[in-house]
Amino acid sequence: MGRWICMYHTVPHARPSLADRRVFRIQPVTQFLATTTTFQHRASSEASYVPLEPGLLLLCCFYPIGNLILLVRLSLVLRNGSLVLPLSCV
């Protein structure tokens, strides 16, 4: 299995520019934890925290398979003051 390479930006329905996006690696995607203020992944012993703006986040996952790259868009849903990340990526 490859690694997830995730790109996000905080402007909905807009194409991210180089200044708006950050690229990082995570594995596996089911380790995602999200709150209203931080986005945390535990891909390694060094957990990374990324600031979030609730309701203003678009997250795209790129999964490399050989020479192909599949684009999977994940949605963060605001529920009871906390962001919920669906674990099913289809």
From Swiss-Prot:
Keywords: Glycoprotein, Membrane, Transmembrane, Transmembrane helix. It is a single-pass membrane protein. GO terms for cellular component: membrane. Glycans are attached at residue 80. The chain crosses the membrane at residues 55-77. It comes from the Eukaryota. It is found in: Membrane. The keyword Disulfide bond does not apply. Cluster 41 protein; part of the gene cluster 41 that mediates the biosynthesis of an extracellular and diffusible metabolite that is able to stimulate colony sclerotial production. This is Cluster 41 protein AFLA_114800. It comes from Aspergillus flavus (strain ATCC 200026 / FGSC A1120 / IAM 13836 / NRRL 3357 / JCM 12722 / SRRC 167). The lineage of its organism: Eukaryota, Fungi, Dikarya, Ascomycota, Pezizomycotina.
